[in-house]
């Protein structure tokens, strides 16, 4: 849906230049775009929205929020979904199948609510999160032959 709604955006380049991109130049795909690795920061966005019934829209929004609250560990800080969905599998199901739900490194923990999320249960460092991701990848690959690809991107001193 989002790909169809976005018309253009203004973004900031690494050199400080403001640039306008049209939808066709954003390379929008499944959990990917020029913004993910391109050094661009979105500063404004133009969307094409359809008019709709306010009550229906509110009902749909409330339903989506309730489903997220039930399935995702929104009560803890996290970077969202930790791994991309491997073709033919669900990352969370593979992680759970391998007995990793609830496992932790330092303050980073595989969520008990949804194994596809690494949460910060208090004091987690980037090193904790990276170590836990590595532990998950190793065990899932050893047991299932599936290499989970992180969706999380590390930036900064410890980002490598």
List the predicted regions and their residue ranges.
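Short, small-residue-biased leader/transition segments that mark boundaries at the very start
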Residues: 2-7
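Phosphate/pyrophosphate- and phosphate-bearing ligand-binding catalytic cores of soluble enzymes
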Residues: 13-134, 138-139, 143-160
């Amino acid at each position: 849906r989002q790909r169809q709604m976005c018309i253009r955006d203004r973004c900031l380049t690494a050199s400080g230049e403001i640039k306008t991109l049209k939808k066709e130049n954003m390379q929008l795909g499944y959990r990917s775009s020029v913004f993910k690795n391109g050094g661009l920061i979105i500063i404004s966005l133009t969307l094409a929205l359809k008019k709709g019934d306010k009550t229906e829209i509110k009902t749909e929004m409330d339903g989506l929020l309730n489903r997220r609250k039930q399935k995702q560990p929104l009560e803890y800080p996290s970077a969202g979904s930790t791994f991309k969905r491997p073709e033919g599998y669900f990352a969370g199901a593979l992680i759970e199948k391998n007995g990793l739900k609830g496992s932790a490194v330092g303050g980073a923990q595989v969520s008990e609510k949804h194994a596809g999320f690494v949460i910060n249960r208090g004091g987690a460092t980037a090193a904790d999160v990276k170590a836990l991701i590595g532990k998950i990848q190793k065990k899932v690959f050893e047991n299932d032959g599936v290499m989970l690809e992180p969706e999380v991107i590390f930036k900064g001193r410890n980002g490598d």
